[in-house]
Amino acid sequence: MLKILFYTGFLIPLLCLSACQSPNNSTKDKLKIFKYNEHSGITSTDPILAKAQSNIWCVNHLYNGLVQLNHRLEIEPSLAKYWTISSDGLLYTFYLRNDVQFIEDKCFKVKNRKLKASDVVYSFNRLLDPAFASPGAWIFRGKVIDKNPFVAVNDTVFQLRLISPFPPILSMLSMQYTYIVPQEAVSYYGRQFSYHPVGTGPFKLKAWEEGSAMYLVKNEHYFEKENGKALPYLDGIKISFIANKKSEFMEFTAGKLSFVSDLETSYIDQVLDDNGQLLAQYKGKYQLMKCPYLKTEYIGFNMKDTSSANPLHDKLVRKALNYCVDREKIITYFRNLIGYPATGGMIPIGLPCFDSTKVKGYSYDLEKAKQLLIQAHYYELQRPHSIVLYTNENYKEIALTIAKEADKIGLYVQVEIIEPNILREWMTQGKAPCFRASWIADYPEGESFLCLFYSKNAAPPNYTQFHNAAFDKLYEQSLLENNLTKRYELYHEMERIYLDESPVMPIYYEEVLRFVQNNIIGLEPNAMNLLDLKRVQIK
């Protein structure tokens, strides 16, 4: 049954468009509808619940934050025209646009309800409020002062005060958790607010058929322009909820989806050749877009497990295992050249602070690995204990390849396949001595990866329970450093420290992969894998 949340006369042609397949349908020719699929569904349109990528993309269509990222991951104004930072780095003052209004909704007592600084205060306090249980509360927790951290100086001036300097805060304010909502809507809809978005974004919700599709239409009063032209260019968006990724791709090849993002590993060879390019039957029919993705796949070692039964308690053994991994081979044979071998640290290609000349990771070198095991007196053990590597089914083949390489030098790696939710639980509880994991940047800053090794952080993010006083000192120093060049130098020094201690084994850096219909223009991929449709056009 179709659940209509909002209704205007525009809804009927939009719904007809989704149903009609006739190429002669005049409405279909007229309306510019971008169609994509969310195989995992959308659970909420509330910004403070924007944890899953599907929710993040949806919130990005419906709401705005004070700042935003362009496709190069540079911070740009959004609801805030500009901002200033006090000399001590504690006070951020944002000057808001005065031409932004929320979409029309019955929750408001006035028409054309304008954005005010008090909306920002409410939204940020709500994000921190335990009553709302936002998974994004960490953004402000422990960073802003306890009493009145957010202040509306007047309707267009908002201030945020920190406990101590924290330069990454601007990048964090680009996260969808921090997008602005009106208090009237939250109060009016209560627990149903997740299904009644009232935002300032380029699109607005018209209908949501749970388990089937969601329909968005353009916000006619959206404030952003491009070269004097009002945004967005699209008339609407249709988001379908097909659970099977292979079926999703078939819908794309049938012309029923405007684009698809990524492919299941089992299906890659049916679409891409060994060089990561479209197979002959797809070349020319579709656009293939790639760019670095701020995601690192790695093997983690539990540094707290120092029992003699765990060979990984010895740093030399951990380093030896790092030299056993043929990262180039993994990318070539298991990934069809999608992604990049992690020959540096955890900070991936795509971040400005990534520098392969200053941070050298591990190459494939079995001879060096053997020498390290000799130094560790590993071969003198009568019955060396095996290393148990926990992973899920999706990474089984890569894990077995690592085990096979390790076996060549007498390191015994036993691969255990367990359910993803159990693996996460064991990682958090410190029950997995060796585990396959991944880390995605929450915001485009090197600190988003280095926080994995700060001893004051529990798991997550510090799943390896790494503790190093020298690293901690540099980490804390970097949080106070406003000069980017100096901050990056601190990042590089930190990377060298943990690489030497080897609490992790970086395997590869991920890559954004998008398959796009030829009539779509203006869809820029980005390293955060954020879907921004306000500048997209359909030819």
What do these predicted ranges mean?
Residues 40-59, 79-80, 106-110, 168-178, ...:
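A structural "hinge/loop" feature
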Residues 209, 213, 289, 294-297, ...:
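Detector for C-terminal structural segments
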